[in-house]
Amino acid sequence: MESADSTGKGSTEQSESQRQSQMDRLDREEAFYQFVNNLNDEDYRLMRDNNLLGTPGEITKEELLQRLQQIKEGPPQPSTEETRGDSVSTGEDPAEDSSNGDSIIDWLNSVRQTGNTTRSGQRGNQSWRAVSRTNPNSGDFRFSLEINVNRTSGTASMPSLDQSAEMPGPEDMEVSSQGEAENVPEPETVPESIREPESVDEPVSVAEPVSVAEPVSVAEPESVAEPESVAASVPVPESVPEPESVPEPESVPEPESVPEPESVPEPESVPEPESVPEPESVPEPESVPEPESVPEPESVPEPESVPEPESIAEPESVPVPESVPVATRPAPVEVTVEEAPIQRGQRRARSRSPDQRRTRARTDRSRSPLYQTVDPPIRRAQHSSSQTVDASNTEEAEGSSRTRHHVSSQVHSSSSNETEGSSRTRQHITARQQALGTEGQSQSTVHLSNPESRSSSQTPQTDSPSNAETTGTGQRPPTIVLDLQVRRVRPGDYRQRDSIANRTRSRSQTPNNTVTYESERGGFRRTFSRSERAGVRTYVSTIRIPIRRILNTGLSETTSVAIQTMLRQIMTGFGELSYFMYNDNDADPNNPTAVSPPAAVPGEVQNNPSAEVRAPIAEPAEPVAPVESDEGSNVATSATRREGRNSRGGVTLEESGSLPFLSLAQFFLLNEDDDDQPRGLTKEQIDNLSTRNYGENDALKTCSVCITEYTEGNKLRKLPCSHEYHIHCIDRWLSENSTCPICRRAVLVAGNRESIV
């Protein structure tokens, strides 16, 4: 009973508070209308043009009067803003400004006077950096804002981001893996994991391939054969480094150098994991089967089934079951490598067996984005057939990887992560270890010593694309990049972008596997942009959110809410925002640093929209069809997920709820209309419409916009169609629309209307 009473009291209090807030809002609205009605034309236009009226009910009459006085006297804000800009340039900007939309608007408006400035700050676990570039000739400037979410391991992950961003750049696995090993090493965890991944890559995969119990036998055969296959299969390992560069053939010639005992020793050490892997062998047999039907009967059947689909793979699978001996495998491996290029497409189409899927899941787990990133190059150079397929299509890779396993093991060293077909991985590991041996035995040793690190090490390599997976604890923080372009708007100028009303286009770019939302709007949903001060109109040119990175970091709900709040505060002044939402999978390796560091250069971002979001993730061999989503809520679609799976492995994009940042779209207030017809009138066009004061005949008439009766003192605006409205109501409407709210007739004849397109 007591609980019921308390509940009743609580609900009563809540309803009372709601009632009171509604009453207060109504009072403020009434005061707003009275204030506007009492303004003369000059004062009204002054406040309207400077966006000082705000929204009815959200501001008191006293505040409106204060704003009017300030604008008449000449706002002191410019000086404070300038000082703000100066402090920003000196790096003294207080973090408070970042959370205040007005302060940023003021700053934006003053930047054109102060020149290039940079602001940075930190709020809690969120660090931000704002950079502006001014064109002294035109007065236009571009503004870039980056928000980074730092976690406990955020600092470590940040460097990894930079490296990872660069990592994608190298096309060759060798380059990327080695470079990563070198670059990643800088991050304490990353270096080891990265180095290990390269050499560990195989060892690691070997460890996981351990599931490749078969690989174990394979690994041993390889290690045994490695002496032999080292020449033959080792070449593949070298090819792994080189394969990255795409030269698999070279791997054959270099086998001798690769054969360096390291590959053999590493395989030996790998064998230890192999013993461990044997348990795993059951899960990974799928991929292993092809390489070594002996290790696991299951794997043998799978290989057979998979191989059958893959004509090339079959030969390998045949050798695997029949010629379990490594010797046979080596030859097939080389053959596969040569044939691989041809098989790539085939395998992709083929790899679809349940086993492959298992391998795929497994691959996702152990696979790291870097590897994936590296994989694409490897695919080209190395047994691009199996590994390329694996890298680009984990599914395909998984399916064909088994078949390729032996071949890919060598080539797959780089793509072993993706394939994660344990057998392949081992072979790759062996080969890779051998290749690594040539590169650096220490790395291979590391791999051997830490086979388990394969998952983590692979992740490190993947770090560049999705650090969260790569470093485990050291996940790279999500980055939000906002690109704004501020233009000087002169009287008479009327371009589509300058229109307060806007149109939004939604398009997807298949080649980049990206989801893109593009808006061109010169104003905002509200009648007048809050940033329209002193003749400056601010609009968002692009906003890019790296969905992939966000997903990989696995943000907690609390963190995402905090970021959303911060973004909303920052965006408040920008009204309706247009944004680009790129899937990180389409990351362009050529522009790795744009997204990762909080200090990304705004100019680059502006010029290369995709570069910002671009994470060092390898583009899947077969581009995933871009997915369009409403307000970004459904960005994670099957296609996107497929893409994500290929590049990031463990992370899945299936649940849209797992993309907390996508909900940020609601703050951007996207207009979903796809019509390209111009909408909205300029202030000059609106002012040219006739107006009149309230008359006795208007006593019982009602404004159709606010649904409020006209009262004495009201100012009415009359449209050509003879319909009348409150001046402030219809002005707001016409800023976004060009038709009468009642009859929907065009307010301006097409001939008299300036071209908006």
Curated annotation (Swiss-Prot):
Record field: catalytic activity: S-ubiquitinyl-[E2 ubiquitin-conjugating enzyme]-L-cysteine + [acceptor protein]-L-lysine = [E2 ubiquitin-conjugating enzyme]-L-cysteine + N(6)-ubiquitinyl-[acceptor protein]-L-lysine
Protein known as: E3 ubiquitin-protein ligase RNF12-B
Pathway linked to the protein: Protein modification; protein ubiquitination
Biased composition (Low complexity): 11-21, 202-237, 314-327, 408-424, 453-466
Zinc finger annotations (RING-type) as residue ranges: 703-744
Disordered as annotated region, ranges: 1-29, 68-519, 619-652
Biased composition (Polar residues): 1-10, 110-138, 147-163, 383-392, 428-452, 467-476, 501-517
Residue ranges with Basic and acidic residues bias: 352-367, 490-500
SMART domains: RING
Subcellular location: Nucleus
GO CC terms in record: nucleus
General function of this protein: Acts as an E3 ubiquitin-protein ligase specific for ldb1, mediating ubiquitination and proteasome-dependent degradation of excess ldb1 in a RING-dependent manner. Does not degrade ldb1 bound to lhx1/lim1, nor lim1 itself and thus contributes to the establishment of proper ldb1-lhx1/lim1 stoichiometry and the formation of a ldb1-lhx1/lim1 complex. Interferes with Spemann organizer function and suppresses secondary axis formation induced by ldb1 and lhx1/lim1.
Source organism of this protein record: Xenopus laevis (African clawed frog)
Region (21 X 6 AA approximate repeats of P-[EV]-S-V-[PA]-[EV]): 197-326
Repeat positions for Sequence: 197-202, 203-208, 209-214, 215-220, 221-226, 227-232, 237-242, 243-248, 249-254, 255-260, 261-266, 267-272, 273-278, 279-284, 285-290, 291-296, 297-302, 303-308, 309-314, 315-320, 321-326
Record note on quaternary structure: Forms homodimers through the C-terminal region. The N-terminus interacts with the homeobox of LIM/homeobox factor lhx1/lim1, with lhx3/lim3 and lhx5/lim5, and with the N-terminus of ldb1.
